[in-house]
Amino acid sequence: WIMGHMVNSIEQVDKFLDLGANAIEFDVDFDDDGVAKYTHHGIPCDCGRLCNKYAVFTEYLDYVRQVTTPGDPKFRKELVLLALDLKLQRISSEKAYAAGVDVATKLLDHYWMRGKNGGRAYILLNIPLVKHYEFIRAFKDTLRKEGHEQYNAKVGINFTGNEDLDEIRKVLEKLGEDEHIWQADGIASCIPRGTERLKKVLEKRDTPGYKYISKVYAWTLVRSSIMRRSLSLGVDGVMSNYPDIVVKVLKEKKFSDKFRLATYADNPWEKFTPI
């Protein structure tokens, strides 16, 4: 999975797909009451990027629904995963539940269309810290109350704050969640980061019987040398400001035999087991 990073304006969606992304990540900004308002990152952000591009959240969902609905004139078959970077750290953790209700409702109304020809992409909920876990409970509660639990099959969870892996596991156990789990490791592109935690994450993923990590991605990678390092370790995904560079690296002999771009037929919630 090549995840285009910080794709926050509507016109950026197709640009990142044209560069080779098959997944996009966008920031969801909330008001003080936990209402999702905009796709917006703000200052500071990654080096070399414009931090203030944005769209109204519901309008953005309307657009990506079209891009991921077969038969729609805007349909792009390559876009298979939407990663919502939920900016919950900007609001009180007591509002995490309200935020989960709001995001689930807006996805039902503007993306899934409550079963009437909605978008088909998988949804990854990127949650900053384990203390925001009530967002997940609220999201699942809302799908159940609204009679649309079928969409749980399309939804995955990821904690992005580089926290202790055992603390993350404990929270997932508390929530009763042991599937559809990604684990990210990374930092803003301007700052160097070693591989110590990433190696631990991959080791957990590859431990037989360990349920709390199915897929792993590294972020935000901009240099081809760091992309090679992460791919050599065996990540499932790379988040980048430059999907075209990831595409070039994947074509190198060392990686072209081992990796290919994920398509809609690939399940993003299953552990990959090489044949």
Swiss-Prot record:
Enzyme class, broadest EC rank: lyase
EC id: 4.6.1.-
Location relative to the cell: Secreted
SS bonds (residue pairs): C45-C51, C47-C190
GO molecular function: lyase activity; metal ion binding; phosphoric diester hydrolase activity; toxin activity
Cellular component terms (Gene Ontology): extracellular region
Catalysed reactions, as listed in the record: an N-(acyl)-sphingosylphosphocholine = an N-(acyl)-sphingosyl-1,3-cyclic phosphate + choline; an N-(acyl)-sphingosylphosphoethanolamine = an N-(acyl)-sphingosyl-1,3-cyclic phosphate + ethanolamine; a 1-acyl-sn-glycero-3-phosphocholine = a 1-acyl-sn-glycero-2,3-cyclic phosphate + choline; a 1-acyl-sn-glycero-3-phosphoethanolamine = a 1-acyl-sn-glycero-2,3-cyclic phosphate + ethanolamine
Tissue specificity of this protein: Expressed by the venom gland.
Protein name: Dermonecrotic toxin SpeSicTox-betaIIA1
Organism expressing this protein natively: Sicarius peruensis (Six-eyed sand spider)
